[in-house]
Amino acid sequence: MPKIKTNRAAAKRFRKTASGKYKCGHANRSHILTKKATKRKRNLRQTNHVRAEDAGRLDRMLPYL
């Protein structure tokens, strides 16, 4: 049986926590930031957690994480 390949795009965007959940960064924070409010940009700094419905999909994409 061959090894399962890790989806490299997902591996760069998601990290697994000790409890087994996935965390990632927020979108909309790379450019065109002048029109966005300071409060919004500050809130985008925090990590985002993946919903349980999508976690199963990530488990298949990241088998060794």
Curated annotation (Swiss-Prot):
Belongs to the bacterial ribosomal protein bL35 family. GO terms for molecular function: structural constituent of ribosome. This is Large ribosomal subunit protein bL35. GO terms for cellular component: cytosolic large ribosomal subunit. One of its GO terms (biological process) is translation. Pfam families: Ribosomal_L35p. The keyword Ribonucleoprotein applies. Keywords: Ribonucleoprotein, Ribosomal protein. It comes from the Bacteria. HAMAP family: Ribosomal_bL35. Gene3D superfamilies: 4.10.410.60.
